[in-house]
Amino acid sequence: QPAIEWRGRARSESHMQGVNVKSEIGNLKKVILHRPGDELLNLTPNTLEELLFDDIPFLPVAQEEHDAFANILRGEGVEVVYLEDLMAEVLDAKPELRQQFLDQWIFEAGIRTDTYKEIIKDYINSNYAGTKDMVMKTMAGINLQELPQKDTHLLVDMVSDRCKLVCAPMPNLYFTRDPFAMIGNGVSIN
């Protein structure tokens, strides 16, 4: 399944100019951050290694430390932009991309049965109508307990643990340099 392609530009009061990063050591003007959120609540001892964590951070402390860091950056004149706001801005500017985004997210989560694809889409669309709320939920992940149960008679459903993550959280988003970096007028996605 192809990745989402979007060649337009989101229009808003904070209309983003093109990316143009030519130095890794020059003055920082703008930074993309993600404030730790509910994705940390879906970390479990069993998922730590897979999600590249050594320990489960305590959410209130992680948020407090993040806020202090973001305030230091702002105090130095750096514009702080949040990843979740950028994603919501794109989806609000191009509403037709919402379902394509959800389909791609479900595909990337490894959901292959049509039953679960529909259950997850219905769950997201019914419970997260606001674009930013929907983006935040995709970052947080989905636990099997959250979804309505259907009697599907599929083997995968019969052996599933009630605490199983159906869609894994993305706790590494607050290390925004790890998944991608701006180089010149492009982006390197790792």
Predicted regions, residues:
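Short, low-complexity intrinsically disordered segments enriched in A/P/G/S/L with frequent Arg
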Residues: 10-13
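The feature marks the mature, well-folded catalytic cores of soluble enzymes
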Residues: 16-190
